């Protein structure tokens, strides 16, 4: 599939994948978010925690992580930018990008920005479908 795509077409597929992911994540649709990963994916986003493995593990991790917001009706928005794609020997893609998380509380005009992160993904593209094989998030404040 990717051999026949131009770079612009590949980038459009990847951008749509990430747009779908963040909208699922930000609206609490964790099962749909996890479905954007391969069945055996690895997902590491919390500093000091072991990565979640498999879609079911990703769903559990996200529910556990978001418990901290229970009773506090914040809206979180993930912003991905500066995406770089590099094809691997196995046909998958190493992707790196910057991510910002913006949190808004009801009635408060100014958002809280952070964390700022550097993200490493491995993407598989098959039959026009993009899925994460893995995601590793590095938090800038820990550098």
Report the location of each language-model feature.
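Residues at helix-coil transition
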Residues: 26, 38-39, 125
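A beta-strand edge to alpha-helix "cap/lid" segment located at domain peripheries
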Residues: 4, 68-143
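Aromatic-acidic/polar surface patches that form glycan- and anion
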Residues: 10, 14, 26, 51, ...
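A solvent-exposed, acidic/Ser-Thr-rich amphipathic alpha-helical stretch
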Residues: 30-98
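Short, low-complexity N-terminal intrinsically disordered segments enriched in polar/charged residues
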Residues: 1-35
């Amino acid at each position: 599939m990717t051999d026949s795509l131009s770079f612009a077409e590949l980038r459009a597929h990847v951008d749509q994948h990430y747009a779908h992911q963040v909208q699922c994540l930000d609206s609490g649709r964790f099962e749909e978010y996890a479905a954007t990963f391969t069945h055996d994916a690895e997902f590491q986003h919390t500093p000091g925690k072991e990565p979640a493995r498999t879609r079911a593990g990703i769903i559990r991790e996200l529910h556990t992580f978001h418990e901290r917001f229970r009773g506090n009706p914040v809206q979180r928005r993930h912003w991905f930018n500066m995406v770089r794609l590099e094809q691997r020997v196995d046909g998958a893609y190493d992707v790196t990008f910057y991510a910002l998380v913006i949190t808004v509380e009801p009635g408060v005009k100014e958002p809280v920005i952070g964390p700022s992160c550097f993200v490493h993904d491995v993407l598989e593209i098959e039959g026009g479908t993009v899925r994460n094989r893995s995601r590793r998030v590095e938090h800038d404040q820990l550098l």
